[in-house]
Amino acid sequence: MVNASVTGIGSMESARRVVEALIRGGVQHVVVSPGSRNAPLVYALAEAQQAIHVVVRIDERSAGFTALGLAIGSSSPVAVLTTSGTAVGNLLPAVMEADHAGVPLLVLSADRPEELRGTGANQTTDQIDLFGSHVRFAADVAAGDLPEPAVRTGLDAALGRLDGVATGPVQLNFAFRDPLTPALDGSDFRPLKSSQPVDAAIETIIPQHQESEHRYQTVVLAGHGAGPQAELFARRHGLPLLAEPSSNARFGPNAVGPYRLLLEHFEALIERVVIFGRPTLSRPVAALMNRADLPRALYLPRPATWFEEGKRSEQIISDWAALSEFTGSGSASWLEIWLAAQIQAEAALDDALGEELSGLRLARELWGSSENLVIGSSNPIRDADLAGRPRSESPRVHANRGLAGIDGTISTATGIALATARPTRLLVGDLTFLHDVGGLLLPRGEQVPDLQIVVLNDSGGGIFTLLEHGTLGDEPAYQAAVERYFGTAHDAELASLAAAYGLEYQLVSSTEQLVEMLQAPVSGRSVLEIRTERTALRGLHDRVRAAISAALTI
């Protein structure tokens, strides 16, 4: 028998307290998916629309990744609100990415009160600890309880303010009893115009320089999330900087271009390795990081979820001065041979690419012409890593490299474009585009970002062509299997999909046309499609490798 006695505050009062606590805690954006059980929070957000930015998405999976993009773009915590049931489960992919990427994503899940759980009530399941170890903190706020303590603790956990806890996602599960709406005559409307927020930005650590007396032939590796401090460190110590695109350190006088091919020639000369962020893109870099004969140091100034103590062989250093002492300063000749080799390699790369409209040429042109760039997983991020020529100042580059999935990329880019309020370009393959094509759906009246989606369409999974599967696919016994299970060819019409969601569309058929299109400003939403053949990929990469190898005289 259900206990009819209820105590504590009502659902609308609880929801208003949640929203005010979020705003005071520095939350600037909330993504909402419609539902009934989360209605109290929806109405509370509507009352606070002058104090907080609310985005509406129909699909919860897209909502989760949109919130992820908003958090990445704003460098601040962002909440995503769903109703109960499977709606919450649809957030799991975004939560997993936020976990491994260290993004402060707050899941606000609505739930039935305790007396309705386990009774067969509609749309009711066990939502507590649904995300397991992927969240830093999870709280079940009972119906009628004051929600502020859970919100404050959740924000502290999401921002890494708790001892030993890395920045990342949290879940706040709010149980609401009927009534789930304000007074139906409108008399209960309580607008929240403003609330003094605290500073909830994610801190960037830029320590003071410490000169070292030692000299080593050290290289600085900058992986995802390294930030501009990696460039600063390499420049101050006179060292070559090998930076992945989403490190946001691939710029400045020490940055080296197609470094993964140069490593084949210079690896034996390297005496020490310093790692910022999390490099994941190439096997030559992975091999260098795992060389037991080399002293290697991983700079880790704060806890990181992708690192477990005792699981990696590098020396872990959290202090800038100690890192400087380990690294030493590079000799002028050490840096010069890398930079000279880069000049030769870049020229050889241009010659090898020619005027052919390939993924590498596309990435090279995009890197040089974009200021706010989102890059999808699989081949696009690796094309940018090989072909993106370092600039004097880095474009702002974003990528979902926490778990490096292809899901949710359009939604993530949409969130980034909204948060930064800057024209944004997204580079993706066709499968990544199709996987999140639902992310193009904006409810009528929602803010439209300035987002240009550049799709490299090779009708399937091109990355497998460059892996061992490509070699196996040449064998008659496996050719059909490799094409079916890894190639996954399709006949999707991207122009029709773009039209269905109200985006402008252009098929780009030449490098000259591509350059012209990239010179035009990004306004509203559009799709540029570039069609290539997967079968040509291995040959192109072989030509590039051979051309660079032949050009090096250092």
Curated annotation (Swiss-Prot):
Pathway: Quinol/quinone metabolism; 1,4-dihydroxy-2-naphthoate biosynthesis; 1,4-dihydroxy-2-naphthoate from chorismate: step 2/7; Quinol/quinone metabolism; menaquinone biosynthesis. One of its GO terms (biological process) is menaquinone biosynthetic process. It is an enzyme of class 2 (transferase). Its EC number is 2.2.1.9. InterPro entries: MenaQ_synth_MenD (IPR004433), THDP-binding (IPR029061), Thiamin_PyroP_enz_TPP-bd_dom (IPR012001), TPP_enzyme_TPP-bd (IPR011766). The keyword Cytoplasm does not apply. SUPFAM superfamilies: Thiamin diphosphate-binding fold (THDP-binding) (SSF52518). It catalyses: isochorismate + 2-oxoglutarate + H(+) = 5-enolpyruvoyl-6-hydroxy-2-succinyl-cyclohex-3-ene-1-carboxylate + CO2. Binds 1 thiamine pyrophosphate per subunit. The keyword Protein transport does not apply. Keywords: Magnesium, Manganese, Menaquinone biosynthesis, Metal-binding, Thiamine pyrophosphate, Transferase. Its cofactor is Mg(2+); Mn(2+); thiamine diphosphate. One of its GO terms (molecular function) is thiamine pyrophosphate binding. Catalyzes the thiamine diphosphate-dependent decarboxylation of 2-oxoglutarate and the subsequent addition of the resulting succinic semialdehyde-thiamine pyrophosphate anion to isochorismate to yield 2-succinyl-5-enolpyruvyl-6-hydroxy-3-cyclohexene-1-carboxylate (SEPHCHC). Belongs to the TPP enzyme family. MenD subfamily. Homodimer. This is 2-succinyl-5-enolpyruvyl-6-hydroxy-3-cyclohexene-1-carboxylate synthase. It comes from Renibacterium salmoninarum (strain ATCC 33209 / DSM 20767 / JCM 11484 / NBRC 15589 / NCIMB 2235). The lineage of its organism: Bacteria, Bacillati, Actinomycetota, Actinomycetes, Micrococcales.
